[in-house]
Structures are given as structure tokens and as C-alpha cells.
């Protein structure tokens, strides 16, 4: 479960401070599917970056399974990202000279998973998104929707919670 308690995020540039988040309070239940909607510039991406440990909040507290992240170190965030969540970015950033399979395996390579296990899990993730027959293609041989599904497979390959 994730809890955001009075989360605030300020960006400072010189003498100017911009408040991106102003006291956000949310609670996400385990395995809950959530959509974050809002106008451009309202803080959706900032909030998701904080939840994903890609950005730090200015004040408040983010709790993961009831544990405060106020004192999290980089290694704690790395463990959380590698074992609990999967990211699908708006720009999927696939590596053009690598195959679809290699792109999905990349996250596991960074986590130190064996080659055989990487391949097995990457193929399973690609099959889940309907691309099991496309593993040897390069990103430029796929449609935009297919590339987005590769990015989804890349997010699923680490077996995020739920």
C-alpha cells in the first residue's frame, strides 16, 4: 500500500520557488488500478516521479507498506523500484539497435539476473502483451502501439507487486 501524507514539492530556481504539489493526501490499496487525470502542468508527473522514487518530495511523507520513506537511501529506492513497481513512460525510449527481446531484458540485466532467466522472463512478458512472435524485430520495424506494448512488457518483466 502507498500513502501520500501532505506531500509538497517545490522547485527552486534562483530567487523563484514554484510549488508543484501543495499538500497531496492519497492512499492506494494493494493491487488497485488507478488513473491520474488532470490538466497539463497540474503535477501528475511530479507526483508519479515521487511515488516511483525518481524525485524527492520537499515535505510530507510517502509511506510504502506503512514504512516512511523520509530516511530512504539510494539503495532503498533502488530495491523498491526493482522489486515493487514498473514504469511505462510516455516516451518509451527503446534502444533502436537492439531487438525487442533485448530491450525488455535490459531491466533484468541491470538487476543481475542470469541470461537464461532474463530471456525466459522477457519472452513471458512479451507474450503477455501479445508480442511473443515479434521478439527478434527492432523497434523501427514496429508500430507506435507495438512499441508502447514493448515498454509495458519492460515494466512487467521485473514482476512488480500485483
Task: Indicate residue ranges for each PLM-predicted region.
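ABC family nucleotide-binding domain
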Residues: 2-162
Amino acid at each position: 500500500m502507498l500513502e501520500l501524507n501532505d506531500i509538497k514539492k517545490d522547485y527552486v530556481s534562483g530567487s523563484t520557488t514554484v510549488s508543484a504539489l501543495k499538500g497531496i493526501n492519497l492512499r492506494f490499496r494493494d493491487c488497485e488500478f488507478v488513473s491520474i487525470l488532470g490538466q497539463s502542468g497540474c503535477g501528475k508527473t511530479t507526483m508519479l516521479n515521487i511515488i516511483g522514487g525518481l524525485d524527492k518530495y520537499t515535505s510530507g511523507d510517502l509511506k510504502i507498506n506503512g514504512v516512511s520513506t523520509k530516511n530512504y537511501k539510494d539503495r532503498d529506492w533502488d530495491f523498491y523500484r526493482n522489486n515493487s513497481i514498473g514504469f511505462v513512460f510516455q516516451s518509451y525510449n527503446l534502444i533502436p539497435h537492439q531487438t525487442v527481446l533485448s530491450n525488455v531484458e535490459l531491466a533484468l540485466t541491470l538487476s543481475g539476473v542470469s541470461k537464461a532467466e532474463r530471456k525466459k522472463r522477457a519472452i513471458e512478458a512479451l507474450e503477455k502483451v501479445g508480442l511473443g512472435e515479434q521478439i527478434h524485430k527492432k523497434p523501427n520495424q514496429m508500430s507506435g502501439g507495438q512499441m508502447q506494448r514493448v515498454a509495458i512488457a519492460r515494466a512487467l518483466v521485473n514482476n512488480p507487486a500485483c
